[in-house]
């Protein structure tokens, strides 16, 4: 299989440390969620940002492939760190909340959102591993 892209990130210090990418485009302190101060981030925020961006790209592509124009999709991804009844360590769950302009029906929007979920590399990577809630609102 062909590799389309590869990147590296290095962390020193775990959840109370620092992370940077090989090109230094990302170079930021890491803190536990309870210690967030606006100057540092945490793994959950980084995951939410990456997944939201990837998913919205997939959603936009699916809409365009199906000749839906001017939908202007927006995706907000909520990441939760929650108790895991099967383990002592917590687990992640996510909600994907998409909004598009009123250019298609709610039913069509839900169909295309599901197609985006099947296409998105983050969704594929997490499939069967975390609970994912999918929601879409069609707005004026």
UniProtKB/Swiss-Prot annotation:
Tell me which PANTHER family the record gives. ORGANIC HYDROPEROXIDE RESISTANCE PROTEIN-LIKE
| Pfam families xref list | OsmC
Taxonomic lineage from the root:
Bacteria, Bacillati, Bacillota, Bacilli, Bacillales
InterPro entries per record: KH_dom-like_a/b, OHR, OsmC/Ohr_fam, OsmC/Ohrsf
The organism encoding this protein is Staphylococcus aureus (strain NCTC 8325 / PS 47)
Which cysteine pairs make disulfide bonds?
none
Can you say what this protein is called?
Organic hydroperoxide resistance protein-like
Query: Matching Gene3D superfamilies, A to Z?
Result: 2.20.25.10, 3.30.300.20
Q: Which family does it belong to?
A: Belongs to the OsmC/Ohr family.
Q: Which residues form a coiled coil?
A: none
GO BP terms: response to oxidative stress
């Amino acid at each position: 299989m062909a590799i389309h892209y590869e990147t590296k990130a290095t962390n020193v210090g775990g959840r109370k440390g620092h992370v940077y990418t090989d090109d230094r485009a990302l170079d930021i302190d890491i803190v536990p969620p309870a210690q967030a101060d606006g100057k540092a981030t945490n793994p959950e925020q980084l995951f939410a940002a990456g997944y939201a961006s990837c998913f919205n790209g997939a959603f936009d592509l699916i809409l365009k492939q199906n000749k839906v124009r001017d939908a202007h999709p927006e995706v907000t991804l909520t990441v939760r760190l929650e108790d895991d009844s099967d383990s002592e360590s917590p687990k992640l769950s996510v909600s994907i909340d998409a909004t598009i302009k009123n250019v298609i029906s709610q039913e069509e929007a839900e169909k295309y959102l599901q197609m985006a979920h099947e296409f998105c590399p983050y969704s594929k990577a997490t499939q069967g591993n975390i609970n994912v809630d999918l929601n879409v609102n069609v707005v004026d």
